[in-house]
């Protein structure tokens, strides 16, 4: 008996510490990537610890294996990069994929619903801070966009977009705690609007449309009403930014079209392994399109094109396999009945990521990727009982 207690006590402590670390990641990623990554290291250590102490079999959701294969082919691309050392250093981001097994192991059962409450609460605080930032802007809003406590407004708006997907899913499909989601939703919506990030707007709208259709197709009739309210109340700066989405003469639109052509040329020259992770910026001037606006860009502002250009067409095929496997699994979970809001949130997050990802390389953003992997893993973790 004493031997059993001696074995169980350390693993129980590891389980509690691992869960606290993952909760901390979800909260801190909205404010500090450094803190979130430190907590991820702790969570990974706890995960490995319970595997050793309890001799647990490693369990992951099925969609993790395509993601692992994507990590593997990324390393192959790095090995054949024009600057292998720099590309291999950039591959440290692949560690973030371990968000999937740590969430799957530690955020089981009711912890998954609690995790959503944590995300909504800290996102509400972040949104409020961003709105205050916007209210204090005195110069050109496009050059002083709210970014919360994060380093860039695109990262900030992308995270808010994902949280909006989760909040609306809880409002429409949740069995409990819908009130808090409804309370924070206006702040989230206003905060993402004032970032003036068009890709996040489009992604959030796509996610909302999907959720409304899943709930009741007739609810899509709400969208024109919301659009009318937006046009009636939006400040001139926001309206001008919205109109620019459809302006082919807009410099940022022209530059994005040029980046697609640049990506096409990179893919044609390096179809199998790409130019190498983090090498697009290095080679940008060599492939720069004559109609490009900016002299250099760090990436191509399109997830599929960026992956194919950096890592090759086989890597893109594996990434699409990951997305397909994840989407099918989440859809099956949604149609299985029971509490469907976590599966709905996952489907909405996938939709938001893919839609916004046509205009921004969000899958390569560490903060965004961590939050995305948390959200899409939750419905599968919730179905599990904590290992005995």
Where are these regions (language model features)?
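A membrane-periplasm/extracellular boundary helix in multi-pass inner-membrane enzymes
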Residues: 57, 128, 212-253, 258-269, ...
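Transmembrane alpha-helices of multi-pass inner-membrane enzymes
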Residues: 19, 42-48, 218-225, 322, ...
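Long extracytoplasmic/lumenal interhelical loops at the membrane interface
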Residues: 247-258, 273-311
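Alpha-helical transmembrane segments of multi-pass inner-membrane proteins
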Residues: 21, 25-26, 72-76, 112-142, ...
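Transmembrane signal-anchor hairpin modules in multi-pass inner-membrane enzymes, especially those
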Residues: 1-86, 98, 106-117, 171-179, ...
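Membrane-embedded alpha-helical segments of multi-pass membrane proteins
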Residues: 34-50, 90-100, 155-164, 201-209, ...
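Membrane-interface helix caps and helix-loop-helix hairpins in membrane proteins
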Residues: 79-88, 193-194, 358-363
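Hydrophobic transmembrane alpha-helices and their immediate junctions
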Residues: 311-351
